[in-house]
């Protein structure tokens, strides 16, 4: 579960390393985001010469959460870290590579570009 002020890792090569959630998209007063949900983030640390800089505000999709996620078949999935992939204004990934596994729930939410770039879909 991701909420405002949550620090997250960035799972792509857009140049950002750590971001902080500043808003959860999807309705008035929505408090939590989980796998596949879109959030607004602020870049807290970035690599020099990257496409994004510190203090940049961007949209992102959550690809991994520490909090377990219950699937329709009754199984649970959880990861070791909270991670996002930064998106451009068209909703496509800003980076050209994705690091680490992503959940297959992204396929249901039509993030096919992220699924195709990911090294492993769990």
Swiss-Prot record:
Coiled-coil residues: none
SUPFAM superfamilies: Ribosomal protein L14
Gene Ontology BP term (one): translation
Segments crossing the lipid bilayer: none
Entry's Gene Ontology cellular component terms: cytosolic large ribosomal subunit
CDD domains in alphabetical order: Ribosomal_uL14
Pfam families noted in UniProt: Ribosomal_L14
Keywords: Ribonucleoprotein, Ribosomal protein, RNA-binding, rRNA-binding
Highest taxon of the lineage: Bacteria
Task of the protein: Binds to 23S rRNA. Forms part of two intersubunit bridges in the 70S ribosome.
NCBIfam families: rplN_bact (TIGR01067)
Family statement drawn from the similarity comment of this UniProt entry: Belongs to the universal ribosomal protein uL14 family.
Assembly behavior: Part of the 50S ribosomal subunit. Forms a cluster with proteins L3 and L19. In the 70S ribosome, L14 and L19 interact and together make contacts with the 16S rRNA in bridges B5 and B8.
Name listed for the protein in its UniProt record: Large ribosomal subunit protein uL14
Organism of origin: Chloroherpeton thalassium (strain ATCC 35110 / GB-78)
């Amino acid at each position: 579960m991701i909420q405002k002020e949550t620090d997250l890792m960035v799972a792509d090569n857009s140049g950002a390393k750590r971001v902080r959630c500043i808003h959860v998209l999807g309705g008035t007063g929505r408090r939590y985001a989980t796998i596949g949900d879109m959030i607004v983030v602020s870049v807290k640390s970035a690599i020099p010469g990257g496409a994004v800089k510190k203090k940049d505000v961007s949209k992102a999709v959550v690809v991994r959460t520490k909090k377990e996620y219950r699937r329709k078949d009754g199984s649970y999935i959880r990861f070791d870290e909270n991670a996002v992939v930064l998106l451009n204004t068209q909703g496509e990934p800003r980076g050209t590579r994705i690091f680490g596994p992503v959940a297959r729930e992204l396929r249901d939410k039509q993030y096919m570009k992220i699924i195709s770039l990911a090294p492993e879909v769990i």
